[in-house]
Amino acid sequence: MLKPALEPRGGFSFENCQRNASLERVLPGLKVPHARKTGTTIAGLVFQDGVILGADTRATNDSVVADKSCEKIHFIAPKIYCCGAGVAADAEMTTRMVASKMELHALSTGREPRVATVTRILRQTLFRYQGHVGASLIVGGVDLTGPQLYGVHPHGSYSRLPFTALGSGQDAALAVLEDRFQPNMTLEAAQGLLVEAVTAGILGDLGSGGNVDACVITKTGAKLLRTLSSPTEPVKRSGRYHFVPGTTAVLTQTVKPLTLELVEETVQAMEVE
């Protein structure tokens, strides 16, 4: 049956929700896929000498902590690194693909790759898959145009900013960055601000945790700092508790005899020549 063409209205459309509910009623045993929440806090900012990137180290599988010391800062080029949030496999393989392309590009042209080139390849690749590659990336590096920082989203959109944060803990991290960021910060001040931003994401989000990793990129090279800070130290137990028998009163007691049926078995030894 034909329907009149109407102008799309703004807001959330519940057509797919009604469709999924109808399919669940008609097809017994059908499991409608649900959106998977991924947890990470990644951040980056530009300071006077370059770019500094930071990330937490927790990898989760739904509500289970799969890895407490996961590396989320990926190598792209000697002066370009990338932080990955979202699906760990998608972020890992996407950054590996771009790193190999940048190596071939450097060998064929004889020039160092630019940060804008890396960002362009990433956003074109992610846009091609229309968000099915769940990788949110922060690209930072230093080239002949100076320090640059980009945020790339899973659907291919991007933005160039002096500071940014992505992941499930981005709200807490951005609150710290927006409050304390200043242009032309020193390395010590930028490093302290980055640690505070990622720590805020770790403490404010259950999907983020572990330690704080960082990567400092300048025109002379990059330095990866593993376990720069450990905001969530394990709590030490005060001691073990011992309770003597009779501490807890027994109110009722019931004894049920268990009948067992004895079965006789004969074992025949194997003849060995």
Curated annotation (Swiss-Prot):
GO molecular function, one term: endopeptidase activity
Modified how: Autocleaved. The resulting N-terminal Thr residue of the mature subunit is responsible for the nucleophile proteolytic activity.
Annotated positions for site Cleavage: G39, T40
Disease with which this protein is associated in UniProt: Proteasome-associated autoinflammatory syndrome 5: An autosomal recessive, autoinflammatory disorder characterized by recurrent, polymorphic disseminated cutaneous rash with annular lesions, non-specific lymphocytic infiltration in the skin, fever, failure to thrive, and persistent hepatosplenomegaly. Disease onset is in early infancy.
Protein name (database record): Proteasome subunit beta type-10
S-S pairs: none
Gene (name only): PSMB10
UniProt-annotated catalytic positions: T40 (nucleophile)
Lineage, opening ranks: Eukaryota, Metazoa, Chordata, Craniata, Vertebrata
Pfam families: Pr_beta_C, Proteasome
Gene Ontology cellular component terms for the protein in this record: cytosol; nucleus; proteasome complex; proteasome core complex; proteasome core complex, beta-subunit complex; spermatoproteasome complex
One annotated GO biological process: T cell proliferation
Induction annotation: Up-regulated by IFNG/IFN-gamma (at protein level). Up-regulated by IRF1. Up-regulated by TNF (at protein level). Up-regulated by tetrodotoxin (TTX) in glial cells. Up-regulated in Crohn's bowel disease (CD). Up-regulated by CD40L via the NFKB1 pathway in cancer cells.
Source species of the chain: Homo sapiens
Residues excised as propeptide: 1-39
InterPro entries: Ntn_hydrolases_N, Pept_T1A_subB, Proteasome_bsu_C, Proteasome_bsu_CS, Proteasome_sua/b, Proteasome_suB-type
Primary location recorded for the protein, binned into one broad class: cytoplasm
Residues carrying N-acetylmethionine: M1
Cell compartment(s), UniProt: Cytoplasm; Nucleus
